[in-house]
Regions:
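Acidic, polar-rich low-complexity tracts and alpha-helical solenoid repeat scaffolds
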Residues: 1-395
Length: 395
């Protein structure tokens, strides 16, 4: 990009636009300081008023600052952009810029102003409206306006039932209901979430908190059933360990400790009682090798951990993810597929979408089209981003 600018001396318009194009190139490479530097040169040109890109340059500049987490500097530039676009509010970038203004205010903990801006976006009913409603709900919760939070998030589910954020909204509605001591309403909401979104990242927390809500209302049999479901469906997660602790407390409170002891004996290899020092030592040692990029040593150590401590170990989900990535980096694709497939079977884990994508792509490359199709379909079910959902749809 710099070479283009050096040679773009005549006419000056070319040089001006070259600065802008260079800024775009740096931005796509996530080189945000260089993006800002090129935009400053672009804006300093004497013929800037003639440029057709000067408005979009504001948008690019604001995003470069935003992506560096300089929210205080990004906000006024996003505001300049929305002012310049005030006659074209149907443009999707207008609503997007408003959302980023809301995010900047949210990061500054100005939750009321953030909520007001998100409300503006929601009223536009443009792209990003569902995100705006979710964020407005979060802001209302942080203002301790729990009834308003539940009302706002309910509108998200009603207006955008297929939104990527519908499960997040439902989870936060349940939490708002608990804050208002509406335990039975929260129980119903958690049940609906687990039924409708069993693979959601919110499912393990919802399952655990459902058990806790049952316990609070002294519905001990239902609490026991819910805690056991969490332990069995989300083995190896922090929620499973918390559920075991909750289960123990329920059995103690209902004077059924013998039943608890009998249940723990059925867990077999699921070493749920506590994370032993050996468990953590083996995992942390292997994890360090992964973080250092020593993938062969990491794969060996993580495989050892998975064999010795899983499915009930405290770090099984992360260990499976790191092992899969290690084999992928080593181009040992059969082993990578094995680990990614195992990861895809751990319900509610945050890596499920990526795991399905990797198995689908690797199977496709091996011309194992039936397997690839299966995982592309699974990925479409759990996809949390529009880009990945598009990948899943086109296979």
């Amino acid at each position: 990009a710099n070479l283009v600018i050096e040679n773009a001396t005549q006419p000056s318009t070319y040089k001006t636009e070259a600065y802008y194009l260079a800024a775009q190139a740096h931005y796509r490479l996530h080189q945000y300081p260089q993006t800002i530097a090129q935009l400053q040169l672009y804006l300093e040109q004497s013929n800037i008023a003639e440029s057709t890109n000067k408005t979009m340059a504001l948008y690019l500049h604001a995003y470069a600052l935003f992506n560096q987490k300089d929210f205080a500097a990004a906000e006024p530039i996003f505001r300049q952009y929305t002012a310049a676009m005030s006659n074209n509010t149907a443009n999707t970038t207008y609503a997007d810029a408003l959302n980023r203004i809301g995010d900047c205010l949210f990061q500054a903990r100005d939750f009321q102003q953030a909520s007001d801006v998100y409300h503006q976006v929601a009223a536009l009913k443009s792209n990003g409206a569902d995100y705006a409603i979710l964020q407005q709900g979060y802001a209302q919760g942080l203002l301790h306006h729990y009834a308003e939070k539940a009302e706002v998030l309910t509108s998200l589910i009603e207006q955008y039932p297929r939104s990527d954020y519908a499960d997040d909204a439902m989870y936060e509605i349940a939490r708002a209901q608990l804050q208002q001591d509406k335990n039975e309403d929260a129980i119903h909401t958690y049940q609906q979430l687990l039924k409708k979104y069993p693979n959601s990242n919110q499912a393990p927390k919802s399952s655990l908190e459902l058990g806790m809500a049952y316990r609070t209302t002294k519905q001990y049999d239902a609490a026991i059933e819910s805690f056991k479901s969490t332990i069995e469906h989300y083995a190896g997660t922090e929620e499973a360990y918390a559920a075991l602790e909750g289960l123990e407390q329920v059995y103690v409170e209902s004077n059924k400790i013998d039943e608890y002891i009998a249940y723990t004996k059925t867990l077999n290899r699921m070493k749920m009682q506590s994370a032993t020092s050996e468990d953590s030592l083996v995992y942390v040692t292997a994890e360090l090798q992964y973080m250092l990029g020593n993938y062969a040593q990491a794969a060996a150590g993580l495989t050892t951990y998975l064999t010795r401590f899983c499915p009930g170990g405290r770090h099984c989900t992360n260990a499976t993810y790191y092992a899969a990535n290690s084999y992928y980096q080593l181009k040992q694709y059969d082993q990578a597929i094995e680990q990614y497939s195992a990861l895809a079977d751990i319900q509610g884990n945050p890596y499920m979408e990526e795991a399905c994508m990797r198995v689908a792509e690797l199977s496709y490359d091996k011309q194992e089209y039936r397997t690839a199709l299966y995982y592309f379909q699974r990925m479409q079910e759990v996809a949390s981003s529009s880009n990945h959902r598009l990948t899943a749809m086109i296979g």
